[in-house]
Structure formats: C-alpha cells, structure tokens
C-alpha cells in the first residue's frame, strides 16, 4: 500500500498529475481543486485502488481529504471517480456538513450524483465523518460570502481592490450581517470614499 508520495511535480493533466520520486514518475489522479505549479515539491496522501482491470493511485493534499475519499468509496454506487468528482466540488467539511445536516442538495451539484445517490451517501455516511472539523465550514462560507459581494460590487462598476477593502471594513465591524446588509454597508463605505 502506498500511503503518501513526496516528490517533484513533473506534469499537470486534467484530473491527474505526475509526481517524480527518485526518477520514477507516478501518475496520480487528483481532485480538480488541486492545482500546484509544475516543478514544485509536493506531498500527496494517497489511496491505492486495485480493480480487476486496473491499478490506480488517487492523491490528496490532506489526510482528511483522503479519509473522506476512502469513506465515500465504501458506499454502493460511489466508485473512485465519483468520489473524486465529489471532492473536486466540495471540501471535506462541506461533505461532512451535508451528511450531518441530512442535506443532499450540495452533493447533487456534483456531476454523476443524482438525488437518489446523494440521499444514499448522506444516509450511509451518517456518523462516519465525525473526525472532520466543521469550524472550517463557517470560515469557508464567510470567504464565499465576501467573494460574492466583491463580485457584485465589481458588477456595479467598482474596482476589485476598493470593493474588497469595503467588504473587509464592513465585516471588521460586524460579522453577523446578512449579505444584503453587507452589500448596503459596503456601498455606503464606497460612497464616502469618493
């Protein structure tokens, strides 16, 4: 079993990378969200999958991501490719939150996962992802929320830097604001700056 690989990233292909380790290039399938520079030193936590007709190595930036992958492939109807597609769209914290909340909608955003399979995933992973920290989810949501508001301000004609500064200023004062309130306060902030 190969638990991890450390080496020089030789090539990046859609859905896979080649990691050179002591002169041997390992083809490793990775989530679409994994995108380091070529010639960078990388460490991937891996899961070796042996099938009748193939041997494939799947790699992840964190042990947590690899653990969630291995939990996903235990579910009937979820093979390594579907599990990889899920981790290309959702973070481990988002998968765990969906399972914890019994909400299959985030999983349905993944290509190849319909309502029935999403429901099966939520049902079968219940209680199995307790090691996944959920506090990251709130931080990720805050970043997503900020990015959405910055994009809205750019759409209204403001520059990216001033939009980001306005949103940051508003959120420094009050983190509990709703998106419309943040947008409104950011517009007020920008109007005062002119």
Curated annotation (Swiss-Prot):
Ranges where the record places region Flexible linker: 136-140
Domain of life: Bacteria
InterPro entries: DNA_helicase_Holl-junc_RuvA_I (IPR013849), Hlx-hairpin-Hlx_DNA-bd_motif (IPR003583), NA-bd_OB-fold (IPR012340), RuvA (IPR000085), RuvA_2-like (IPR010994), RuvA_C (IPR011114), RuvA_C_sf (IPR036267)
Record region (Domain III): 141-194
Keyword Ribosomal protein carried by entry: no
Pfam families: HHH_5 (PF14520), RuvA_C (PF07499), RuvA_N (PF01330)
Chain positions covered by the region annotation Domain II: 62-136
GO cellular component: cytoplasm; Holliday junction helicase complex; Holliday junction resolvase complex
An annotated Gene Ontology molecular function: four-way junction DNA binding
GO biological process terms on file: DNA recombination; DNA repair
Principal subcellular localization: cytoplasm
Keyword Protein transport: no
Cellular compartments annotated: Cytoplasm
Region described as Domain I: 1-61
Keywords associated with the record: Cytoplasm, DNA damage, DNA recombination, DNA repair, DNA-binding
Subunit organization: Homotetramer. Forms an RuvA(8)-RuvB(12)-Holliday junction (HJ) complex. HJ DNA is sandwiched between 2 RuvA tetramers; dsDNA enters through RuvA and exits via RuvB. An RuvB hexamer assembles on each DNA strand where it exits the tetramer. Each RuvB hexamer is contacted by two RuvA subunits (via domain III) on 2 adjacent RuvB subunits; this complex drives branch migration. In the full resolvosome a probable DNA-RuvA(4)-RuvB(12)-RuvC(2) complex forms which resolves the HJ.
Family per record: Belongs to the RuvA family.
Entry domain remark: Has three domains with a flexible linker between the domains II and III and assumes an 'L' shape. Domain III is highly mobile and contacts RuvB.
Function summary: The RuvA-RuvB-RuvC complex processes Holliday junction (HJ) DNA during genetic recombination and DNA repair, while the RuvA-RuvB complex plays an important role in the rescue of blocked DNA replication forks via replication fork reversal (RFR). RuvA specifically binds to HJ cruciform DNA, conferring on it an open structure. The RuvB hexamer acts as an ATP-dependent pump, pulling dsDNA into and through the RuvAB complex. HJ branch migration allows RuvC to scan DNA until it finds its consensus sequence, where it cleaves and resolves the cruciform DNA.
Full protein name: Holliday junction branch migration complex subunit RuvA
Record organism: Tropheryma whipplei (strain Twist)
């Amino acid at each position: 079993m190969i638990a991890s690989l450390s080496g020089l990233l030789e090539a990046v292909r859609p859905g896979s990378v080649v990691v050179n380790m002591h002169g041997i290039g390992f083809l490793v399938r990775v989530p679409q969200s994994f995108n380091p520079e070529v010639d960078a030193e990388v460490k991937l936590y891996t899961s070796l999958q042996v099938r009748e007709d193939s041997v494939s190595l799947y790699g992840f930036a964190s042990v947590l991501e690899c653990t969630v992958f291995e939990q996903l492939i235990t579910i009937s109807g979820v093979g390594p490719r579907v599990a990889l597609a899920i981790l290309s769209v959702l973070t481990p914290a988002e998968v765990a939150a969906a399972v914890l909340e019994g909400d299959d909608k985030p999983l349905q955003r993944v290509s190849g996962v319909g309502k029935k399979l999403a429901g099966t995933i939520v049902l079968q992973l219940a209680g199995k992802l307790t090691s996944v920290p959920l506090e990251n989810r709130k931080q990720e949501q805050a970043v997503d929320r900020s990015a959405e508001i910055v994009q809205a301000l750019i759409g209204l004609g403001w520059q990216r830097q001033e939009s980001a500064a306005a949103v940051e200023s508003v959120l420094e004062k009050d983190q509990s604001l709703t998106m419309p309130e943040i947008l409104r306060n950011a517009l007020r902030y920008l109007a005062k700056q002119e």
